[in-house]
Amino acid sequence: VGSEMCIRDRHTVRKSFKKLAGVFKKEGGVKNRKGIILFLVAFFLYIDGVYTVIDMATSFGTALGFDSTGLLLALLVTQVVAFPSAIVFGKIAGKVSNELLITISVCAYTFVGIFAIFMQSIWQFWVLAVMVGLFQGGIQALSRSYFTKIIPAEHSGTLFGIMDIFGKGAAFLGTLLVSIVTQATGSVNLGAIPIVCLFVAGLAVFIITARYNKPFIAQSQRLEDEME
């Protein structure tokens, strides 16, 4: 079943790339193609890391001796923390650039991955659950807000559809890599190494894409200021 899901997800991502190429080819007026493509690649990498952390939480908890009740409670804690933190991120986003907040969020998730590598006790798992909750809702909302600023408004519907496809198809790579490393090393903790790599790679691409997107974000900000 897992292999079938991976194959299906790979096909989904491949289709999204083809759809994106079709949009750019059909809509000759779409600007900032490099910035859009690079951001989608960065988004795919770091959001894959986010989904993988969530998916693999059960394995980490079980390895530490959690029963099903404990795992459900940990999941509940994550959701309880995620709701208010998403609201806080939304308020901060009005004062601080989305670029900076996304960078902070990805760095925080990178730390979560590193923390998971060395996690040895149950209390550390609770700390992990809280840390994941702090940034879980914010990073997705911030990514969509950032994407809004770098794409042409007239093509937002199509491009957001492609972004959603990238998000839905981003679950296979991290899970596959974690499974390979875990089976090769026999350690669930070392299985978190690929997660860290996804976040580092995603952050690196995101930093690169900022150079292409800066003028479009500045233009979007000017329009927002004029409307106010």
Model regions: which residues?
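Juxtamembrane intracellular "pre-TM" segments in multi-pass secondary transporters
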Residues: 8-40, 227-228
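Short amphipathic helix-loop junctions that connect adjacent transmembrane helices
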Residues: 55-71
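Helix-to-loop junctions at the C-terminal end of transmembrane segments
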Residues: 84-98
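Structural signature of the two symmetry-related core transmembrane helices
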Residues: 100-115
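A membrane-interface helix-boundary motif in multi-pass transporters
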Residues: 180-199
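Multi-pass alpha-helical transporter architecture, strongest
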Residues: 193-228
